Amino acid sequence: MAFNRRSKNITQGVSRSPNRSMYYAMGYEKADFDKPMVGIANGHSTITPCNSGLQKLADIAIKTIKDAGGNPQVFGTPTISDGMSMGTEGMKYSLISREVIADCIETAVNGQWMDGVLVIGGCDKNMPGGMIAMLRTNVPSIYVYGGTIKPGHWKGKDLTIVSAFEAVGEFTAGRMSQEDFDGIERNACPSSGSCGGMYTANTMSSSFEALGLALPYSSTMANPDDEKVGSAAESARVLIEAIKKDLKPRDIVTRKAIENAVAVIMATGGSTNAVLHFLAIAHAAEIDWTIDDFERMRKKVPVICDLKPSGKYVATDLHKAGGIPQVMKVLLDAGLLHGDCMTITGQTVAEALAHIPSVPSADQDVIHTIDKALYAQGHLAILKGNLSPEGCVAKITGLKNPVITGPARVFDDEYSAMDAIMANQIKAGDVLVMRYLGPKGGPGMPEMLAPTSALVGQGLGESVGLITDGRFSGGTWGMVVGHVSPEAFVGGTIGLVEEGDSVTIDARQLLIQLNVSEEEIARRRANWKQPAPRYTRGVLAKYAALASTASKGAVTG
């Protein structure tokens, strides 16, 4: 049986002689034209430690695909470092890079008639961008995550990149010495690999394991470790078998599979960005999945992993404790996973987990049993109210003050808000309203890790609320609400809030409310005028023109 189902369109027949000439220039032989053409979307980059260790994974995938009878075709995908661009205009390109990555992979795979694709990525948007492309093209595919960074250390404490962000607030508030500030900066990131807590990169990679399009244990391996190279090689072998069986992403990514992925996100305390990305992933798969489905899942899936940012441990600790397979086994036995979902290996979820113990090891405290869950319900809540009738996203577990009503401190950009925080002008009880930062208004929904971390560092993480139509980093915690929809730029109520207005965030009632009369809101709405777009040319302008509302994933098509 021929396995070059697609690539034969570009390699076979008399009319394709010029095509073959170009392949011969790259060392191909005649027999190679009967083999599958397998794309390797390589996200290697020296921009960020998240991606600086990916080339070795691409190299082993190339060798393995050749050895298994395929023709590897390598092409690059871009990346943006969320951590480095945070707090700058560059952060506006982060979410946009999700769309660019998806478009790049779709363009290469379909333009070159590839028979399958292995996607390698590291930083946050690499994962959803790659998955969206895999689902759009729907050729046999597998995701190879670059792996997590190892924790840093300073004076006996484990560090992550969030430690450095929070140190900024502590230092400016006079709560940290210069020695400790410099020590944390120098030691927070000790190796290659993606940010080490259950932040966005590790959240998305973990969910891809649960989804069935990444190999077991692959999402919690550290990039510097040899097992990560071994996992990449095995991923390439599995992909060749999937090509032979014509097992495609849309055979695997069903509504039930998305429920499995979201269950793992809830159980591990994952990033708010997962809400946005899975709306986009479902859209690419043409699956009916809405923002309200996250709330439905939250109510039935407990948090069973004690992981940063709100918990104690990092991804390497989770790996030692049994990784995502152990988390999934606990959920499966509790009836919280669909065991009949297919995975890229050809096994069902239940078959893949058959050898995993039902009870996590007693010599670890990372993964809990259901009866000893950290929180009885999930942490990613969908709040609604007159400030966000389409819904917005908040992390609500572990809050000492689940309800806050306070005066609005209104900022139309991130930088003025950050200046106010650094000048100690924000006080306990305030509710920061940061707006015109949505998909169209930002544009690009920049993340607010810099201001939220500064608040935490100043000791205000539990006593100040923050509302935005932008996003939050996976490293954010506290009384923060993002993805407010409709956004300010299209006339959402968040754009009508005035300085000093009373605003309520109620995590118990899942309510977000501007405490102003309907008549007053109507008056303000009648007087509101849409501001001029911040960008009129280039990729930011393109995204602003095309992006959907955050409640539908901020997708472009």
Curated annotation (Swiss-Prot):
Which co-factors does it depend on?
Answer: [2Fe-2S] cluster; Mg(2+)
The reactions it catalyses are: (2R)-2,3-dihydroxy-3-methylbutanoate = 3-methyl-2-oxobutanoate + H2O; (2R,3R)-2,3-dihydroxy-3-methylpentanoate = (S)-3-methyl-2-oxopentanoate + H2O
Mind telling me which InterPro entries this protein's record contains?
DHAD_IlvD/Edd (IPR050165), Dihydro-acid_dehy_C (IPR042096), DihydroxyA_deHydtase (IPR004404), DiOHA_6PGluconate_deHydtase_CS (IPR020558), ILV_EDD_C (IPR056740), ILV_EDD_N (IPR000581), IlvD/EDD_N (IPR037237)
Instruction: Enumerate the UniProt keywords alphabetically.
Output: 2Fe-2S, Amino-acid biosynthesis, Branched-chain amino acid biosynthesis, Iron, Iron-sulfur, Lyase, Magnesium, Metal-binding
Q: Where does this protein act, in terms of pathway?
A: Amino-acid biosynthesis; L-isoleucine biosynthesis; L-isoleucine from 2-oxobutanoate: step 3/4; Amino-acid biosynthesis; L-valine biosynthesis; L-valine from pyruvate: step 3/4
The Enzyme Commission number assigned here is: 4.2.1.9
Q: Where does [2Fe-2S] cluster bind?
A: 50, 123, 195
Q: Which GO-annotated molecular functions does the record name?
A: 2 iron, 2 sulfur cluster binding; dihydroxy-acid dehydratase activity; magnesium ion binding
Which superkingdom does the taxonomy of this entry point to? Answer: Bacteria
Catalytic EC class: lyase
Q: How does it assemble?
A: Homodimer.
PANTHER family this protein is in?
DIHYDROXY-ACID DEHYDRATASE DAD, DIHYDROXY-ACID DEHYDRATASE, MITOCHONDRIAL
Q: What is this protein called?
A: Dihydroxy-acid dehydratase
What is the originating organism of this protein?
Herminiimonas arsenicoxydans
Gene name of the encoded protein: ilvD
